[in-house]
Amino acid sequence: MMETLSTMDILPVSTTIALLLTQTTMSDKLFLWVEQYRPKTIEECILPDSTKKVFEGFLKQGEIPNLLLSGGAGVGKTTVAKALCNQLGSDILVINGSDEGRFLETVRNTCKVYASTVSLTSKARHKVILIDEADNTTPDVQLLLRALVEEFQKNCRFIFTCNYKNKIIAPLHSRCSVIDFQTPSAEKPQIARAFFTRIKDILDIEKIKYEEKVVAAVVQKFYPDFRRT
């Protein structure tokens, strides 16, 4: 029997919106839709045209520079980083800057072991280390990362994501291509409509009935944080 989402379902909003796009599967496996439906390619990512063209350019070149991706929560920084690696066929190591990324020795040992080895299966020119939420790492960890970027430049690329780029030390800025995930005002309606359509597509796939005005309310409430919708 199909579930129907109605206007009453968004009361209280904080609870119902969380339920709208977060689903526990019938097989008792907890599976967040944000992961299940995460875009696998840059083409699938909902981005301003100018930003998407930058990443498409990297794909045409067949490699990426060191990147610093900056923008608010849920705008697609991590998704873009993973999509780039997926399309380039790059091995990727993810380190969470809010967790293990705060410990100097952990970062040093993990990165060195990974970056100093050559992949036997990947056809990409470089391996990738993704430092997610890099603005939550400590200053000494950032100084270490600066050194690692230089030490392993022939074999490895680094992608840093952050909400606040002012919390990233200048030496890392200068060693990366900095890309701001900001949507020009003129493109905001287009981006919101694209995500509105994406949500409806997901609900249709999951066979969940819905009212369009409820989906629109979700997008309007949390835009541009798409992860929360």
Name these PLM-found stretches:
Residues 198-203:
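Conserved phosphate-handling catalytic cores of large alpha/beta enzymes
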Residues 222-229:
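The conserved phosphate-sensing helix
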Residues 207-210:
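Secondary-structure boundary elements
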